[in-house]
């Protein structure tokens, strides 16, 4: 399994992208290896289980959560993963198959507090909310602390605020970029594989652009965008008109692949990033909001490719070389909360949870 996986890693690295997340079958094989680790591979196996299995309600997540639950509940012993570590890892899986075991672990004298810390940052509780409430009503101290944390919105306040000032490097795409430029229809089959699909972003030659596709019609300016990151700042997608055309979450995924940051413990997905345009199409604006990005409409005429620009989101100013080059107002101050929460969707679900608690 490891040999096959490493070959796959090498093939993907040649394309400049990370490996695919592990499948349910690979995850099951990985767990067998964890039970009886080959010498020298111990750390790698734990890393793979920690960072390369999808979260949520994926088939592989089910396999991972079942095993971690068995270890956390003391039904299985694992030399490489303690009960406490297994509980922590369950807490990184967002929702779905990890919730039941974490709620059960609130009763555990040794690791109940670890389960509580995990649930405090978990928003996708749905009906399991009532199970936590019942335990709290019966006097379970861990469940009470979870309810209190949700009521105090610690899932939100524990995250950093959007800073007063952001330094960005401009990746400027002249003219109108529609969602087919960002997520081409002929490449639709790769859309679920976000890093692979992102290679097709801007794959066709554009008039007046300061970049060339690496392979016209096949591969976009991947290395060019990477070279902009070498300046050490966030790279912002900047265009005259951005995101017109059909609604495609995949278009946002591709932009965020190059401009966002990794979602911790979730393979091959990113969030955040900055997108600037004279005009940003409404549906594209919304999908950016959902993903925790900062989309701002402002005059981008004085921003050129590779410029380093200071963005002051609360003041509504963009500054280059000490001079204000554009002023703006965000569409709603809620945008700043959405960015802090990691997206509009977590903000909505989190607020609901806090209101209930």
Residues of each region from the PLM?
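Fe-S-dependent hydro-lyases/dehydratases of central metabolism
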Residues: 98, 102, 107, 115-357
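Structural detector for internal amphipathic alpha-helices that build alpha-solenoid repeat scaffolds
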Residues: 15-20, 42-59, 73, 80-95, ...
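Well-ordered alpha-helical segments embedded in enzymatic catalytic cores
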Residues: 29, 44, 85-86, 220-223
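Amphipathic alpha-helical scaffolding segments comprising HEAT/armadillo-like alpha-solenoid repeats
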Residues: 24-32, 55-75, 93-107, 125-136
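Short helix-loop boundary/capping segments at the starts of domains
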Residues: 36-39, 51-58, 188, 257, ...
């Amino acid at each position: 399994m490891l040999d096959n996986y490493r070959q796959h890693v090498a093939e993907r690295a040649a394309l400049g992208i990370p490996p695919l997340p592990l499948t349910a079958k690979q995850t099951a094989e990985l767990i067998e290896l964890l039970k009886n680790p080959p010498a020298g591979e111990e750390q790698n196996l734990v890393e793979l289980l920690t960072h390369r299995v999808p979260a949520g309600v994926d088939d592989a997540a089910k396999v991972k959560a079942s095993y971690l639950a068995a270890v956390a509940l003391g039904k299985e012993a694992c030399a490489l993963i303690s009960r406490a570590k297994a509980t922590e890892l369950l807490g990184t899986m967002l929702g779905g198959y990890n919730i039941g075991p974490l709620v059960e672990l609130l009763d555990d004298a040794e690791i109940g507090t670890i389960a509580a810390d995990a649930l405090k940052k978990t928003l996708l509780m749905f009906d399991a909310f009532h199970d936590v409430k019942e335990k709290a009503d019966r006097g379970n101290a861990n469940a009470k602390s979870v309810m209190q944390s949700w009521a105090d919105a610690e899932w939100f306040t524990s995250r950093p605020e959007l800073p007063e000032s952001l330094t960005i490097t401009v990746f400027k795409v002249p003219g109108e970029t529609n969602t087919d430029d960002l997520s081409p229809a002929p490449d639709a089959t790769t859309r679920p594989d976000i890093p692979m699909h992102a290679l097709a972003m801007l794959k066709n030659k554009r008039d007046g652009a300061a970049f060339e596709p690496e392979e016209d019609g096949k591969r976009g300016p991947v290395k060019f965008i990477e070279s902009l990151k070498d300046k050490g700042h966030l790279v912002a997608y900047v265009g005259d008109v951005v995101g017109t055309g059909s609604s495609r979450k995949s278009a946002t995924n591709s932009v965020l692949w190059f401009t966002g940051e990794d979602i911790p413990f979730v393979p091959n997905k990113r969030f955040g990033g900055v997108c600037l345009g004279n005009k940003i199409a409404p549906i594209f604006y919304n999908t950016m909001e959902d993903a925790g990005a900062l989309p701002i409409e402002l005059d981008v005429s004085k921003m050129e490719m590779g410029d380093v620009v200071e963005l002051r989101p609360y003041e509504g100013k963009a500054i280059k070389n000490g001079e204000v080059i554009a002023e703006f107002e965000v569409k709603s101050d809620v945008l700043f909360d959405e960015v802090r929460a990691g997206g509009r969707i977590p903000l909505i679900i989190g607020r609901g949870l806090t209101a209930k608690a």
